Amino acid sequence: MTQPTQSSTWQQHLTRAWTHRGWLAWLLWPISLLYGVLVKLRRSLYQAGIFKSERVPVPVIVVGNVVAGGAGKTPVVMMVVRHLQARGLQVGVISRGYGRQTHDCREVCSDSAITDVGDEPALIQRSTAAPVFVASRRVDAARALLARYAQTQVIVCDDGLQHLGLQRDLEICVFDERGVGNGFLLPAGPLREPWPRAVDLVLHTGTPPAFAGFSAQRTLSRYALMADGSQQALGDLAGPTCLCNKPLLALAAIAKPENFFTMLRAQGLTLARTLALPDHYGFDSWSHNDYEGYTLICTEKDAVKLWPLEPDALAVPLVVTPEPAFLAQLDARLDRLLPTDPSPTLSLAHGHTTT
C-alpha cells in the first residue's frame, strides 16, 4: 500500500492540468502570457548587456530542462560526468544546491550536511567523486571550483538552462515521457520558457520520445548500495527466499515516486509497503520506530539524507544509458572546444554565447 504524498490538493490538480489544455489550464493562460513576456524581457536584457553574463576559461556544459517538476536531469548529469571522466578529462560540477539552507558558495564534501549543500549535489559528489561546488550564482561556483582545482578541463552545470548569468558552450535539454505537457508556460503549463528553442542536444529519457531528439533508457542497477559503499545484489532481495529476513518497505522522495516502485517490482522485488514522499523531502520528522520492522530500500538521492538516520537502508541507483549517437555528438561538439595543447587553460574566446 502506498502512503499518500504530502502534496497539497491544488498542486495535484495543477500537475494534472499541465498534461492537457483543460478548463484550469485555460483559466491560468492569461497569467502565462504575462509570464512569457517577463521571460522574453529578461533574456533581452542579458542579450543587450544590461544584465551581466559572465564566461569562465573552460568549456561549460549545462544539463537542464524547460519543464517544471523534474525530468530526470540529475542521473543524466552523472552519466555525462562519468563519460567525460572515462575519456580522461578532469571534470568539475556546479549547482545552485536546491533546497539547502545556506546561501554561500562552498564545496560539497563527503561529510557535508545535506542542509548545507542540497541532496542532488551531495549525490553527484558521492556517485562520481568529481569536485562539486554550490552557489546561488553559478559563475561564483565555477570560479571557486577552478581556483581550488586548477586542472579542471570541463565544467558540468547541474540545471541552469534559465540561469543566464553564466555563459555556456553546450546545452543539453532533458525530457521525460511528459514531453512539454500541454505546451503552455507556467502556471497554465509546465514550461519554464517557450519551447522549442535552440539547444545543442535534446535527450529523451521517456518512452516513446515526445519529439525529435536522442533517446536514453532508464533502468535500475542490478545491485543496491549500502552506506559503507558495499553492494547487495537485488536478486538476493527478491522472492520468498529474500536474504534480508524482513519485509521490504520502498520509499521515494522524488518527482514521480511510483515510477521507482514500479521499477523495483519489475526486478522481482515484493514490496510490503511503499512510502511516497514530496520531492527533496528532508526526513526531519522521520521516526525510526515507525519502520523498524522493515528493510528500507530507496533511491540514491534519498539515501544521502536517510543513511544518517537509517544506516542499514539500501539505495538502488538509477542508470541512464543514452543511445551511442548522443555520446558521439557530445564528444564531437566538445572536442571542438577543447585545446589541442594538454594544458587545461583556455582562452576566454572559446565557445559561444547562448543568452
UniProtKB/Swiss-Prot annotation:
Enzyme class: transferase
Binding-site positions, ATP: 67-74
Protein's UniProt keywords contain Nucleotide-binding: yes
Domain of life: Bacteria
GO BP terms, alphabetized: lipid A biosynthetic process; lipopolysaccharide core region biosynthetic process
Reactions catalysed, as given in the entry: a lipid A disaccharide + ATP = a lipid IVA + ADP + H(+)
GO cellular component: plasma membrane
Key words, A-Z: ATP-binding, Kinase, Lipid A biosynthesis, Lipid biosynthesis, Lipid metabolism, Nucleotide-binding, Transferase
Cross-referenced InterPro entries: LpxK, P-loop_NTPase
Molecular-function GO terms, alphabetical: ATP binding; tetraacyldisaccharide 4'-kinase activity
Pathway note: Glycolipid biosynthesis; lipid IV(A) biosynthesis; lipid IV(A) from (3R)-3-hydroxytetradecanoyl-[acyl-carrier-protein] and UDP-N-acetyl-alpha-D-glucosamine: step 6/6
EC number: 2.7.1.130
Known role: Transfers the gamma-phosphate of ATP to the 4'-position of a tetraacyldisaccharide 1-phosphate intermediate (termed DS-1-P) to form tetraacyldisaccharide 1,4'-bis-phosphate (lipid IVA).
HAMAP family tied to this protein: LpxK
Family as reported in the entry's similarity comment: Belongs to the LpxK family.
Protein name per the record: Tetraacyldisaccharide 4'-kinase
